[in-house]
Each structure stands twice: as C-alpha cells, then as structure tokens.
C-alpha cells in the first residue's frame, strides 16, 4: 500500500487555499462546492469546508482493498466501514486510527469493472 492522500476538514476553505498558494505555491487541481484538492507530487491534499475541524483522513492506494482490509483488521485496526464500491470509481474501506484520524484504503476500479457492476 502507498499513501496517496490526506483529507482535512477546515473551517475557512478560502483562507486555507490562500495559505497553500502563498506558502507552497500550490493551486487546486480540482475545486468543488465546499471542497478543493491540491497535489503535492504523488500525494493529494483534500480540503473540505465544515464548521468543525474534526477528522483527518489518511488515504492509502491499494491493489486489493479487501485483502489489505483483512490484514490491518487482523493486526488490530478497528473497522469503520468495510470495503465497498463507491460512486467515485473506487473500492474503499475506512478504519479508525489514533485520536481523530481515519484511515482509508482505496482501490481504483477500472471502467470495465464499474460498467459490469452497474449492469447487474
């Protein structure tokens, strides 16, 4: 598994984007309503705006979400959500980390897998 993103909740999205632009010269590679994605080499930083700054998510890219999920749960990780296909084209599972950290295992689904899933 390789780390591929951090997902952070911020109170002031515009302020956070201005800070990353000023300090790191980082511009969003994606901007949606109340959220933005910045790229730092192979790592994505996902910023979501919310009133409470609560949870940080660390995402790991995996070739086999189900197998890696079983491995880390077998090592004592606590599951939040078991592996499932997500609408954004990945198979993902969520685990409870220390403090307010959530860990996400994310496996890219190819277009053929998504097409066959939606056909059934």
Q: What do these predicted ranges mean?
A:
Residues 1-17, 44, 56-60, 109-120:
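N-terminal beta-strand motif that seeds the catalytic metal site of vicinal oxygen chelate
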Residues 3-11, 36-39, 50-120, ...:
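Vicinal oxygen chelate
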Residues 18, 51-52, 79-80:
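General secondary-structure edge motif
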Residues 25-56, 102-109:
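Conserved short beta-strand elements that form part of the metal-binding/catalytic scaffold
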